[in-house]
Amino acid sequence: MTITQPDLSVFETVESEVRSYCRGWPTVFDRAQGSRMYDEDGHAYLDFFAGAGSLNYGHNNPVLKRALIDYLERDGVTHGLDMSTAAKRAFLESFQNLILRPRDLPYKVMFPGPTGTNAVESALKLARKVKGREAIVSFTNAFHGMSLGSLAVTGNAFKRAGAGIPLVHGTPMPFDNYFDGKVPDFLWFERLLEDQGSGLNKPAAVIVETVQGEGGINVARPEWLRALAELCKRQDMLLIVDDIQMGCGRTGAFFSFEEAGVTPDIVTVSKSISGYGLPMSLCLFKPELDIWEPGEHNGTFRGNNPAFVTAAAALQTYWADGSAMEKQTLARGEQVEQALISITEENLADVKEYRGRGLVWGIEFKDKDRAGRIAQRAFELGLLIETSGPESEVVKLLPALTITPEELDEGLRTLARAVRETA
């Protein structure tokens, strides 16, 4: 692909230096449809990024777009705080009937604000309020958001340093396989909890991602998650699952914890819950935890009604037919895994490991700078991928769940070429 030099001057002179994704993809995007984005010069890019997981159903999904346009054309409420609206009712009914009831999940639904970190902040606040304790346990390489409470339970040193103040009341513990399986799971954690001389304040809750997306595609085993849930129950701690990136079908089932057979006390959901890339987040919790006073936690943009419209349409379109969406995602995931096996076999001296679940995969190279070079070459070849991990050492694959097998094969062949050409 021949890419002419785009005019990026206004971004470079007016926008803050904090911008990041645009540095790796130096073009001006103009439109998008399905699994492709197009720049101003008409160049097409196959998207294996999906808005960092906020576009599980692709760009400008036609069913969701039609529902949104119809709603706006009839002057439906756009901004509603937490007022009762027809759009919110339609979403809550769809979510209850299509997601919660079939899974026997009795969760109450809270709208904490537009973004994932809003959901995490509300989850941490609620856990502390319920238990009357301050400490929260998180895990190595976790990522839960960029606001101060979320940063306190995030592992990445670079992101934590941006807080500018001490990040307190968060205690990190080793994630699954952090010690390469050499140390029994939870041995250290449980010993600290039971030892009155350990110096560990009893936590209110444990927050965990079943797959650490930003942390490097670290996949927790189902048995590890079950053991964690049992430990929380024994020690009177709430279990919070952060399903912001891995929920909404990303790993196959709607919730990423379903495979493990656990029922978290609190669940945070965002990114693809709106289905269309519109800001929306949820904090779900067991009814007995709903001890909020009216208005005790709020936010101006927690009632994003256009997002409720597309969210309801997404649930009705993709999740009304039992396990069809889950089966499709798992089949696409097997296609990705087979391609990564081939790439690994062709680069045995260079590849450290590949790992993933559903349609989230990563491939790690022994040379920590290799992932960045691969992502850059992939962009030049018309494929959008990002890196993850504490040192950006993992190539991360996050295509839309609606991607076709042909598009997936095209992108995987481009990835293999980028790997070869950066050796």
From Swiss-Prot:
N6-(pyridoxal phosphate)lysine sites (modified residues): 271
Involved pathway(s): Amine and polyamine biosynthesis; ectoine biosynthesis; L-ectoine from L-aspartate 4-semialdehyde: step 1/3
InterPro entries on file: Aminotrans_3 (IPR005814), Aminotrans_3_PPA_site (IPR049704), Dat (IPR004637), Ectoine_EctB (IPR012773), PyrdxlP-dep_Trfase (IPR015424), PyrdxlP-dep_Trfase_major (IPR015421), PyrdxlP-dep_Trfase_small (IPR015422)
Sample GO molecular function, one term: pyridoxal phosphate binding
EC number: 2.6.1.76
BP term (GO), one: ectoine biosynthetic process
Assigned keywords, A-Z: Aminotransferase, Pyridoxal phosphate, Transferase
Cofactors named for this entry: pyridoxal 5'-phosphate
Similarity annotation: Belongs to the class-III pyridoxal-phosphate-dependent aminotransferase family.
UniProt-recorded name of the protein: Diaminobutyrate--2-oxoglutarate transaminase
Source organism (scientific name): Streptomyces avermitilis (strain ATCC 31267 / DSM 46492 / JCM 5070 / NBRC 14893 / NCIMB 12804 / NRRL 8165 / MA-4680)
